[in-house]
Amino acid sequence: MPQLNTTVWPTMITPMLLTLFLITQLKMLNTNYHLPPSPKPMKMKNYNKPWEPKWTKICSLHSLPPQS
């Protein structure tokens, strides 16, 4: 059986890796990356809340244990 000649492998692999690296760099160069969003100042709206001026009960009487 003849031996496999591997002397030209580094000669072929090195330019292939260099070419792949250059292609990926060129593709990334043409890619548009968006800037992170900047926060916008928000205006707080005052809604009419009828429960604010009133006192409300926190617990219902039915949820309390029976008292003797």
From Swiss-Prot:
GO molecular function, one term: proton transmembrane transporter activity
Modified residues (N6-acetyllysine): K54, K57
GO terms for biological process, alphabetical: proton motive force-driven ATP synthesis; proton motive force-driven mitochondrial ATP synthesis
Primary site of residence: mitochondrion
Chain ranges passing through the membrane: 8-21
UniProt similarity note: Belongs to the ATPase protein 8 family.
Name the record gives this protein: ATP synthase F(0) complex subunit 8
